[in-house]
A protein has these predicted regions:
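N-terminal low-complexity segments that are often proline-rich with Ser/Thr-Pro
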Residues: 228-230
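Domain-level signature for soluble enzymes in the chorismate/prephenate branch of the shikimate pathway
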Residues: 1-226
């Protein structure tokens, strides 16, 4: 049975790529905001949600850490997607015709070298896939986009240069969300299980220290922890 997977962004977003890699036969459901992507799972419009929570270069993603606890959804798995940017333009364009590179502001910051080498002027767009769509619709051979290979396929753009990102270890961690609890997706069933906890401590000295001490005495490894003020 085909499952629907919601994600934030336009068709061709890296989140859609992640959804298709985890669920190859899924029906991707693009949503304009993270709130909409989470609501689609809560309301039953989607079986799962594919949500990015942190990037190896840019750090954690927006307000996700605030939205997830309030969503009431269950994290049933995670997926690490290597982020590979393609420099793309309309058919007939080439490296001598392009003058601008359009993409999300974070993506532009992760592709500085190629823009400097080609003397391209950065243009900020709402998201990576959206920049590919806009370039495609413009028909302008002087405009290029930095987006996923999937976006180039969807919007019928030619890839002028492949994998142009500054750092090859650029990776985004996604969590897979479900309205109902499920067994963690470990493949063979023998992998390490990761648990995500959200808790609040009292506003007293050493409260966090004492809370974390419980993990130490139980020999529980903490992969990461973050604190937020109320």
């Amino acid at each position: 049975m085909t499952v629907t997977v919601s994600y934030q962004g336009e068709p061709g977003a890296f989140s859609q790529q992640a959804a298709l890699e985890v669920f190859p036969r899924c029906e991707p459901l693009p949503c304009p905001t993270f709130e909409d992507a989470l609501a689609a799972v809560s309301d039953g419009a989607a079986r799962y949600g594919m949500i990015p929570i942190e990037n190896s270069l840019a750090g954690r993603v927006g307000d996700i850490h605030h939205l997830l606890p309030r969503s009431g959804l269950h994290i049933i798995g995670e997926f690490f997607l290597p982020i590979r940017f393609q420099l793309m333009a309309v058919k007939g364009a080439n490296l001598t015709t392009i003058r601008t590179a359009e993409s999300h502001v974070v993506a532009l910051g992760q592709n500085r070298k190629i823009m400097k080498n080609l003397k391209l002027r950065p243009v900020v767009a709402a998201d990576t896939a959206g920049s590919a769509r806009i370039v495609s619709e413009s028909g302008d051979a002087s405009r290029a986009a930095l987006a996923s290979r999937l976006a180039a396929e969807i919007y019928n753009l030619d890839i002028l240069m492949e994998d142009v990102e500054d750092e090859k270890y650029n990776t985004t961690r996604f969590v897979i969300l479900s309205k109902y609890p499920e067994f963690a997706r470990t493949g063979t069933g023998t992998g390490t299980i990761i648990t995500t906890l959200v808790f609040r401590v009292r506003n007293i000295p050493a409260a966090l220290y004492k809370a974390l001490g419980g993990f130490a005495v139980s020999y529980t490894h903490l992969r990461a922890h973050e604190t937020e003020a109320d």
